[in-house]
């Protein structure tokens, strides 16, 4: 039995879970999100909790059981609290601006890099060096943050680039002079 899958998911007040044939829809104060459901897994909603059941006991069914329980728990947390990732731009002359649904990155290229935010994602800049990405979909928030970091990943010699706020950059020693 999946240890993660057998735990019921508590539904906080203000959150509504609707189970369809092949999709589960979660609606809350921060928005709405839907997640597809594998046919091997079924959901039952009762007493402000959701239970995840699987049809058999094969290896794949056990894996899908825990996966779908975690995905639904992330959906419920996303529509009630939301998710966010904070990026920091490190380097002389490096800065970030948010203009509506666009992020403009000046990170040492000859031109500014424009990144258009997908639907459901919001960004806010704190000063010129910190950028917070937030939304209800945990996977999409992480993907957008990773794509922005990929524009100029931190380099190991001076630590310049775009990094997560809690990321530690492993530094290398420079060349040894004669």
From Swiss-Prot:
Function: This protein binds to the 23S rRNA, and is important in its secondary structure. It is located near the subunit interface in the base of the L7/L12 stalk, and near the tRNA binding site of the peptidyltransferase center.
Source species, domain of life: Bacteria
Subunit structure: Part of the 50S ribosomal subunit.
Pfam families registered for this protein in UniProt: Ribosomal_L6
Tagged with keyword Metal-binding: no
Entry's family note: Belongs to the universal ribosomal protein uL6 family.
Lineage: Bacteria, Pseudomonadati, Thermodesulfobacteriota, Desulfovibrionia, Desulfovibrionales
NCBIfam families in alphabetical order: L6_bact
Protein name as catalogued: Large ribosomal subunit protein uL6
Record-annotated disulphide pairs: none
Keywords noted in UniProt: Ribonucleoprotein, Ribosomal protein, RNA-binding, rRNA-binding
GO CC annotation terms, alphabetical: cytosolic large ribosomal subunit
Entry's Gene Ontology BP terms: cytoplasmic translation
Claim: Transmembrane helix is one of the keywords in the record: no
Species: Maridesulfovibrio salexigens (strain ATCC 14822 / DSM 2638 / NCIMB 8403 / VKM B-1763)
